[in-house]
Amino acid sequence: MTSLAERAAQLSPNARAALARELVRAGTTFPTDICEPVAVVGIGCRFPGNVTGPESFWQLLADGVDTIEQVPPDRWDADAFYDPDPSASGRMTTKWGGFVSDVDAFDADFFGITPREAVAMDPQHRMLLEVAWEALEHAGIPPDSLSGTRTGVMMGLSSWDYTIVNIERRADIDAYLSTGTPHCAAVGRIAYLLGLRGPAVAVDTACSSSLVAIHLACQSLRLRETDVALAGGVQLTLSPFTAIALSKWSALSPTGRCNSFDANADGFVRGEGCGVVVLKRLADAVRDQDRVLAVVRGSATNSDGRSNGMTAPNALAQRDVITSALKLADVTPDSVNYVETHGTGTVLGDPIEFESLAATYGLGKGQGESPCALGSVKTNIGHLEAAAGVAGFIKAVLAVQRGHIPRNLHFTRWNPAIDASATRLFVPTESAPWPAAAGPRRAAVSSFGLSGTNAHVVVEQAPDTAVAAAGGMPYVSALNVSGKTAARVASAAAVLADWMSGPGAAAPLADVAHTLNRHRARHAKFATVIARDRAEAIAGLRALAAGQPRVGVVDCDQHAGGPGRVFVYSGQGSQWASMGQQLLANEPAFAKAVAELDPIFVDQVGFSLQQTLIDGDEVVGIDRIQPVLVGMQLALTELWRSYGVIPDAVIGHSMGEVSAAVVAGALTPEQGLRVITTRSRLMARLSGQGAMALLELDADAAEALIAGYPQVTLAVHASPRQTVIAGPPEQVDTVIAAVATQNRLARRVEVDVASHHPIIDPILPELRSALADLTPQPPSIPIISTTYESAQPVADADYWSANLRNPVRFHQAVTAAGVDHNTFIEISPHPVLTHALTDTLDPDGSHTVMSTMNRELDQTLYFHAQLAAVGVAASEHTTGRLVDLPPTPWHHQRFWVTDRSAMSELAATHPLLGAHIEMPRNGDHVWQTDVGTEVCPWLADHKVFGQPIMPAAGFAEIALAAASEALGTAADAVAPNIVINQFEVEQMLPLDGHTPLTTQLIRGGDSQIRVEIYSRTRGGEFCRHATAKVEQSPRECAHAHPEAQGPATGTTVSPADFYALLRQTGQHHGPAFAALSRIVRLADGSAETEISIPDEAPRHPGYRLHPVVLDAALQSVGAAIPDGEIAGSAEASYLPVSFETIRVYRDIGRHVRCRAHLTNLDGGTGKMGRIVLINDAGHIAAEVDGIYLRRVERRAVPLPLEQKIFDAEWTESPIAAVPAPEPAAETTRGSWLVLADATVDAPGKAQAKSMADDFVQQWRSPMRRVHTADIHDESAVLAAFAETAGDPEHPPVGVVVFVGGASSRLDDELAAARDTVWSITTVVRAVVGTWHGRSPRLWLVTGGGLSVADDEPGTPAAASLKGLVRVLAFEHPDMRTTLVDLDITQDPLTALSAELRNAGSGSRHDDVIAWRGERRFVERLSRATIDVSKGHPVVRQGASYVVTGGLGGLGLVVARWLVDRGAGRVVLGGRSDPTDEQCNVLAELQTRAEIVVVRGDVASPGVAEKLIETARQSGGQLRGVVHAAAVIEDSLVFSMSRDNLERVWAPKATGALRMHEATADCELDWWLGFSSAASLLGSPGQAAYACASAWLDALVGWRRASGLPAAVINWGPWSEVGVAQALVGSVLDTISVAEGIEALDSLLAADRIRTGVARLRADRALVAFPEIRSISYFTQVVEELDSAGDLGDWGGPDALADLDPGEARRAVTERMCARIAAVMGYTDQSTVEPAVPLDKPLTELGLDSLMAVRIRNGARADFGVEPPVALILQGASLHDLTADLMRQLGLNDPDPALNNADTIRDRARQRAAARHGAAMRRRPKPEVQGG
C-alpha cells in the first residue's frame, strides 16, 4: 500500500497546494508539503567584479570574466603577509582574492540606524540589509507591504572578521557590539526593520550555509510557517587571519584561481559577496501574478558523519543528499542538464565530488541521452564560503531562466584522479545554449560545508504564466518617485532617468509606471512626473532631480496635506483662446460634461459652448465671456469629480458665485446659466463705463486713501494686503499714481465695466425683475459667500443683485474657509486668484493653493500634475509587466570601527588618487579624493606667491599612479612599461582646507589612453587642471647614461640661500618640500643635486615617483638658472607647466641624486629642461624630458574664493571718554563752516536744515567761530571759505555738511544724491584751493540714512556718500572725511558733538559712523564668508534673464555664463549696435539659447521696461536680472566736472533704479547689481563711479529690507574684460574670468546681499596707500598687511635729525625712490634710480595724476610733510621732490642742484592763486555767526 506522501507526490503542484490548504484549515499536518514547488521571484546580489544585481551578474557570467585580483591594501598588506611556505608563521600562501569594493559604505540613515550603531554593525549585516531590500524590489514586492506578514528570513553567515577587528581595539567597544556582530542579529535586524513575523534564522554550516538557508526557507514555505521567504548569505573578508589558517592546510591556491576539476587544481581562492533570493510557494506566486524566475523542485541536506576527518568530504554522503533532493523533487537525474557544483578546485575535494556526481547525474551516457554540464561560479568570483551556495544558486536560476549555460573558467583537462569517459558529465569551456529537451530546463546546485553539512537543490524552469498586460497606453502616465527625503527622491529620479534613456530604453512607459506605482515602497516623501511619452518622462525626471520646475512635475513639497477641500470659482479674466481643446480630446469626463451641458447652454445663452471650445476662437464681449466661463467651470468641476476629487465647500468670486451655487446644488445648471446670461447681458449695456484698479493696500489704507475721491469705492477685498477699487477712470488713475509714489503695486484691471460700484445701479432693478421667479434650493455643499457675511446665503434674485453691486468679500471668505479646510483649488481656465489665496492663507503655512489649468502650459499635463498634488494619479497602472528598474540608490557613508589602514602601515588608497571606480563601459576609470591641506597638510608647504598650490609634480604622480592602477600594475610597484607623454598643467590648482579632486583615465577610440585631472567649482562645473597621455611600451631598463657615473664637481650653492632666493620670486618651499640637501652648478650650465625626502613629507608605498622627489628635481632645473636671473622679479616666477615624457624604471628610495639640464628658449618665452634621477646603487631610476618652465606672473596664480571676498560690517564701538572741558575745547578751537540745503521743499531737507540751525546755536562759542552757507550755492560756499582762509586767530578746523533725509520716492532720492555729491565735491575743491597747511576735517551728517540692522532700508542718497568718503580717504587723506549718521529719534546733536570733540584722539579715525540710540556703530572692512549649503537657485533651465550693459566685456561673460547654465532666453541691453566681434560671440551663444539685443540707454525712460517685456515674450518666466551697465571716466575730485559726474552716474545709479521699477511685478530668483570695489575699498580718481556704485549698493539693501530679491557684487578689476582698472598693478590684481564665474555661482547660491570680490595685494597695499593705517575701517586689512611686510623698516622723520645733511638727503632720496617704484608698478627700485637720472621729470616715466596723489600720500606717511601734487605733475624729478621735502623738514641741503624745486613750487603756487582769485571775484559775502 502506498503512503500518503507517495500518493500526494503524484498530484500536480496546484493540487498539492489546494490539498495542503484544506488540511491546514482542518488542523491536520501534511507531511507531503515538502514536495510543493517553490518559486524564485526576486534576486539581489553583490559579488566581485562590480556585480550589483542579477543583470550585471549574468553579464559577468556570459562574458566569462575572471574577477580575482590582488588583495586590496585597505584589507591588509598582501606582501607583508605573503610567504610561499605554508609553515611560515603568521603568513599566507596567496596574495589573491575576489573582493567587493566599498565594504565600509552603508546607508544607515535609510534604515533609521544611528551612526554609532552603524559603526558597530558588522559590514556583513549592513550589506545583507541593502541586498535584501534590493531583492524585494527585484521581486516587485514593496518592502513596506510585508510588515506584520509571515515573511521569514534565513541567512547563512560564518565569518567573524569584523568582530576580530573590533576586539583588536577594545577601547572602541560599546554596547552596540552585542547587537552589531552576532550572526543572529543579522537576520533579526532585517525582520525588525521590515516588521516581519515569520521565522528569522541565521545558519552557520560554513561553506554550505547559504544553500542550507535556502533549503530551510523552502521547507518553511511548504510547512506554511511562512508565505514569503528571504534566503541567502553573506561573506566578507576583512582580516588576514582566516587565510593564514587555511594556508596551514594548503587549502588556498598559490596561483589565486579555482581550477575546478582541472589537472592544475591547487586549492581555492577566497571571494566575498552577498546574495539574497525571494521565495514564495509557486501556487501563491501564480495567484499573485508574480514574475517567476525559476522553481525550486526539491532540496535536501545531510551530514558527512564519520569520514576520513571532520573536514574531509564524504562521497557517499554527497551522493545521498543528491538522491534525496531528486526524489523529493520527483524528477529523474537524466532530466538535469546542468549542475552548479561545489567545485572549489582542491586536489582532494574535486575527485570526491565528481564521484558522487557520476553516481547520480553521470549515469545513462548513451544514444539519445543529453549531456550534463558541470560548472562552478568559483572560477569567476572565488569561493564565497558562507555565500558560495547562494552565488551558485543564483547562477543556476539565471541559467535556466535564460536557457544558456555559461562557460567554466580555468579548465583545460580533467584532474588525473577523475575519469569522466563513461559518464554524461562534461565541463563547458565555452558558453552554449541549453540542450534541447522535451521537458522544462532543470539544473541542480551543490554546496558542501567544512563541518560536513551538505546541501543540494534542484531548480527548474518557471512555468509559462500569463502576466496581465498593461491596458491601452493612457494618454498620460504618472510616475511616482518615492524616497525618505527630498534628496533621495531627487537621486532616485536621476538614476531612473539615466536608466530609461539607456539600459531601459525598450521598457514601455506604462510598465515603468506600473512597476514604480505598484511594486515599490512608498516613503515619507514622494514626487510625481506626469508624461505623455518616454522623452517627456525622462525630461520630467531630470527636472525633478535637478530641482527645476517643469510642467507635469510635482515635487515633494507640492503635495496637498490635511483634510478639507475648497473649490474656488474665479470671476472674469481667466478666459483665453483654445481653452479646453486638449481636455476635450484627452479627458472623456470633461468632454461628456460639455456635451451634456451644451443643449442647456444653447437654450439659455443662445450659442453652443461645445462648438465654441472646439473652434478655439477668442471669446469677446462680456455677454459671451461670462456664460462661457461658467460653462467651463462646471465642466472642469465634473472633471475633478471624475477622479474622485469632491469639494467640501465652495467659494465664488463675483460671477464665480454662480458656478459655486450650481456645484453646491443651490441652483440647477439651467438656473445658473440663466442667472449668468441675464447678468452679463445687462452689464453689456454699461460697457466702457468706469475703471478698476488693483492696489497693494489693505482695506483700511485703501478706504483712507479714496476718502478724498467720493466717486471711487472699494470693490474687492482681495487679500490682507491687496484691494480693488472702482470708479471713474480719471479718478482711478489719480489713485494709482498716489499709491505708486509709495513704491507699492498699483495697476489697472482690464474690465468692460466697473462692477461692484454705483455705476451698476441702473441695471439692478431689471436684474431683480428678470430673476424674480428663481427658486433656489438649500445647498448640499456649504457655500461660503463673498457677497454677505451670512453663512447660509439664499441664491435668489436679491442675492444676485447684491452679488453684482456689493464689494466682493473674498479675503474674508477665504479666511473663514481656511479654519477647517486645507486645500484650495481654483476652478478656472487660468489662475487669477492664486496670489490672493496664497497671500491670505500663507501666514500659517498649513494650506495648499492649486489651480486647474494654465494657459501657458499643456492643459492635460498641468491638470494631471494638479491631480497628483492632491494624491490622485491619472492612471493607477494596476496592470502591467514588472520591469527591472534600477534599485533604490543608496546614499552611502563610511562607517568603520577604526581606520582600515591601521591593519598595516601601508595604506590602501593612493593619497592623491583616492577611491577608485572602474566604469562599466569603455574601460574608463575614475578616482576621487580630497587633496586639501587639512587632509594632506604637507601640500601646504608648496606655495606660489603665498598661496598653497598643487605642485606639477603632484599632478605627474597622479597620472603615473592612475595609469599603473588602471593598467594592472600593483599599487606599490613601479611601472617600467608605462610612459607618460605630453603631460601638461593647464590651470594651477589652489588648495584650501578641502579640495576635492577627480582623476579620469579615458580609453579613446584611437587606442590612446589619456589621464585628465579635475577639480570642481562651487557652481558644480568641472575644471580641468592637468592632462597626460599614457603609453604602454615593452618593459625596459634604463640605458647606460653618463650621469650615473658618480657625483660631479662644480660650484656649490647653499640650499638655504637657494631657497631664500626662490622665496624672492614667490616660490615658497616649506619643510616638506625643502628636499635639496646639496646643490652643485656645473660649467656646462647644468646642475647636480642630492635629494632627501624630509621627515615632514608623507611615506606611502603607492607613490611611483614621490611628488616631493620630483618637485625637488624640478627645483634642480631652477638651480641651473643664474642667481641674478632668478631674483630678477618679485612679480613673476618660472614654474614647470609641461613635460614631454616621464619614465620611471625602478623604485626610488628616500634619497636620490639628480642631474638637471637647462636651455633658454628664443624670445625669452621660457626655459626647457631635462632631469635624470640616479638611485644610491648608481642606476638611473627615472627620467623626465622636455620640461617647459614658463614665466608665470603673480596675478595668474588662482586664489580660493574665500581669499577674494570682502564685506563691510557694522561693529559697535563706544566713543572714547571725552577729555576735560578746556582741553576738549582746544581740539575744536577755530573756524567752522556749517553747510546745509537752504531749500526745504521736502521733509528730509527741512529736518536737515533744522538740525543744522540748532547745531550752529549749540556749537558756537568764544573759541569757535561758525560760518554758514547753502551747500548748493557754489558761490556762497567759495565765499565762506575765502572768509575763513585769512583769519589767523580762528584757523579753519572743520566743515560740517548736513545732508537731507529720506524721501518717499526713490526718484527724488536719486536726484538728491547726485546733487549732494556734486555739492560736496565743490566743498572739497574749495578746501584744496583755498586753505593751506593742515586741512580742516570734513564731516558729512545724515539722519537715519544708513542701514545698520538688516531690517533698516536706509536711503540710497545718504549711503552714496560712503563712496565719496572712501575715495577722499586716498585723494585727500588729510581732510579725514567722516560720515556720521545720527538717530533723529533720540538726541542727535549730543552724539554729533561727542564725535567732533573726540575727533583728535587716537591714532586712527572712524570714517563711517552710525548712532542708534546711545549705541555707536562703526563700519569695518572684513573678510566675507559664504554658506553654499543654502542652495538658492542660480540659473533655471529654460528661463529668461536680462543683462544691462550686455554688450560690454562683463555683459558678454555673464551672457555666456547664463547660457552655459541652461538659460533659455537672454536679453542683452546696450547703447549701440553690436560690433563684428560682439556679433561673433552672440552667434555662438545663439546656437544654444535665444539671445536678443535691445538697444537703448537703460537710464532713459522706457528702456528698462522694454528689456523686461522682451524677456517675457518667449513664454519662459523671467527669473533674474543683472545690472552691469557702467561708464567709467576717472577724474580726481579736484578736477571733476558736473558732466563727468552725470555721465558716470546715469548708467550705474539711474539705470539701477529703472531696472528696479521695471521688475516690480516680476517673480525673480535674484536681482543682481554689478557694483565696484571702489565703493567698498576706495579708489583715487573714481569718486563719481564710487558714489554711483554706493548708491547701487544701498538700493540693493533697500530692496532686501522691502522683501525683494537683491544682491550686489563689488567687483575688483577683471583681467580680460571690464572697465574699472584704476588700482590694477598696485593694490588689486585682476580677477580671471574663471574666478569671476566661480564667484557668481557661489555668491548667488549663498544668497548674500553684498560682497566685494577683489584680489587684494597684501604685500603692496601699505606701500601704495600708507594712509590706510590711520583709518579704522581698514583695521583688519592692516593687521593682515603688517604680517606681510611693506617697504622695510623706516625710522620716520625723527631718524633724519641724527644724520648729517648728505646722509639725510640720501635717506630721503632712497625712501622716495622706493615709494615711486611701488606706486608706478616697478618691481625693482633700480628702474627709477640709478638707471634713470635723478633729475629726469617723473612725468616722462609715465606718471599720471592718480600716481601723483599716491606719491604725495606716501610722502606724508613717511615724513609728516607732503610735496604738492601740482609740483609732482609739473615736471618735478626725484631730486626736486627730495629738495622740497628737505626744505619742509628744516634740513639744510648741501646739493645746489636741488634748487629747481623752488621754481616749480612757485609756478604751482601762482597757478593756484590765479584760480583762487577767479573764485573770489564770483563770491558773495557769506553769513557769519559765532563769537
Curated annotation (Swiss-Prot):
CDD domains attached to this UniProt entry: KR_2_FAS_SDR_x, PKS
BP terms from Gene Ontology: Actinobacterium-type cell wall biogenesis; DIM/DIP cell wall layer assembly; fatty acid biosynthetic process; phenolic phthiocerol biosynthetic process; phthiocerol biosynthetic process
Residue ranges, annotated region (Beta-ketoacyl reductase): 1439-1617
Pfam family, one: PP-binding
Keyword Aminoacyl-tRNA synthetase in record: no
E.C. designation(s): 2.3.1.292
Cofactor binding annotation: Binds 1 phosphopantetheine covalently.
Enzyme's top EC category: transferase
Keyword Transferase attached: yes
Domain Carrier: 1706-1785
Catalysed reaction equations from the record: icosanoyl-[(phenol)carboxyphthiodiolenone synthase] + 2 (S)-methylmalonyl-CoA + 3 malonyl-CoA + 5 NADPH + 10 H(+) = C32-carboxyphthiodiolenone-[(phenol)carboxyphthiodiolenone synthase] + 5 CO2 + 5 NADP(+) + 5 CoA + 2 H2O; docosanoyl-[(phenol)carboxyphthiodiolenone synthase] + 2 (S)-methylmalonyl-CoA + 3 malonyl-CoA + 5 NADPH + 10 H(+) = C34-carboxyphthiodiolenone-[(phenol)carboxyphthiodiolenone synthase] + 5 CO2 + 5 NADP(+) + 5 CoA + 2 H2O; 17-(4-hydroxyphenyl)heptadecanoyl-[(phenol)carboxyphthiodiolenone synthase] + 2 (S)-methylmalonyl-CoA + 3 malonyl-CoA + 5 NADPH + 10 H(+) = C35-(phenol)carboxyphthiodiolenone-[(phenol)carboxyphthiodiolenone synthase] + 5 CO2 + 5 NADP(+) + 5 CoA + 2 H2O; 19-(4-hydroxyphenyl)nonadecanoyl-[(phenol)carboxyphthiodiolenone synthase] + 2 (S)-methylmalonyl-CoA + 3 malonyl-CoA + 5 NADPH + 10 H(+) = C37-(phenol)carboxyphthiodiolenone-[(phenol)carboxyphthiodiolenone synthase] + 5 CO2 + 5 NADP(+) + 5 CoA + 2 H2O
PKS/mFAS DH domain sequence ranges: 910-1198
Residues engaged in binding NADP(+): 1440-1485
Database matches in InterPro entries: Ac_transferase_dom_sf, ACP-like_sf, Acyl_transferase_dom, Acyl_Trfase/lysoPLipase, Ketoacyl_synth_AS, Ketoacyl_synth_C, Ketoacyl_synth_N, Malonyl_transacylase_ACP-bd
Keyword terms: Fatty acid metabolism, Lipid metabolism, Multifunctional enzyme, NADP, Oxidoreductase, Phosphopantetheine, Phosphoprotein, Transferase
Region (Disordered): 1807-1827
One term under GO cellular component: plasma membrane
Biased composition (Basic residues): 1807-1820
Reported function: Part of the PpsABCDE complex involved in the biosynthesis of the lipid core common to phthiocerols and phenolphthiocerols by successive additions of malonyl-CoA or methylmalonyl-CoA extender units. PpsA can accept as substrate the activated forms of either icosanoyl (C20), docosanoyl (C22) or lignoceroyl (C24) groups from FadD26, or a (4-hydroxyphenyl)-C17 or (4-hydroxyphenyl)-C19 fatty acyl from FadD29. PpsA initiates the biosynthesis and extends its substrate using a malonyl-CoA extender unit. The PpsB and PpsC proteins add the second and third malonyl-CoA extender units.
PANTHER family membership: FATTY ACID SYNTHASE, SI:DKEY-61P9.11
Name listed for the protein in its UniProt record: Phenolphthiocerol/phthiocerol polyketide synthase subunit C
Lineage: Bacteria, Bacillati, Actinomycetota, Actinomycetes, Mycobacteriales
Chain's gene name: ppsD
